[in-house]
Regions:
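Bacterial N-terminal signal peptides
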Residues: 5-15
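Conserved class I S-adenosyl-L-methionine
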Residues: 52-61
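Conserved SAM-binding motif I beta-strand of class I
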Residues: 76-81
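A short SAM/SAH-binding and catalytic strip from SAM-dependent methyltransferases
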Residues: 116-132
């Protein structure tokens, strides 16, 4: 029985590409690298976030983008995160800050999420992950919705704006796209 269990685990590992294993599974499309707060603020500024917006952060990690969207910009926000421990951390932070009425943290894959309510979508994913997500964005998002990507472009889309931000010795690119103006 033990040999069968080991064989099943080995087979499951082989069924998932090595790049996906590195990030914890086939649905996890990027490593967990928290966005520095200066970039969080700048991404939301570049998107022109206002209190009437609904900000979706795909791969929301510890919740810093959705929390900032609610606290500093007055927006409603939804964070979608695959990793349960990060969801728990984000939910705890949201509760501690009294933002439960403005921020929702959803545990699951953003590849299967309904993005239709979003007026702003934030991303800090790899270019290949953005490519995999692009059909969902094109299907779900209405014209005028702003998509902001930190460091990694969405291939085949024309950005409305490209902003360079320096943090210490690193230089970051913030890509702003507007649905309906990406071609």
């Amino acid at each position: 029985m033990r040999i069968l269990a080991i064989a099943l685990v080995a087979a499951a590992c082989l069924a998932v590409p090595a790049s996906a294993q590195q990030f914890g599974g086939a649905e996890n499309l990027a490593p967990n690298i928290p966005t520095p707060q200066i970039l969080v603020d700048r991404m939301l500024e570049v998107a022109g976030v206002e209190p009437s917006d609904v900000v979706y952060d795909l791969g929301s990690g510890d919740g810093r983008i959705v929390i900032t969207a609610a606290q500093k910009f007055g927006a409603r926000a939804v964070g979608i995160e695959l990793i349960p421990a990060l969801c728990a951390t984000a939910r705890r932070r949201v509760k501690d800050l009294g933002l439960e009425d403005r921020v929702e943290i959803v545990q699951g894959s953003f590849l299967h999420a309904d993005l239709k309510p979003a007026t702003v979508v934030t991303l800090y994913l790899l270019t290949s992950s953005n490519e995999r997500l692009k059909p969902n964005l094109e299907k779900d998002l209405k014209p005028g919705v702003r998509v902001v990507s930190n460091d990694y472009p969405i291939r085949g889309w024309k950005e409305s704006r490209l902003v360079m931000v320096r943090t210490g010795s690193a230089e970051h690119r913030i890509y702003l796209y507007k649905i309906g103006e990406t071609r």
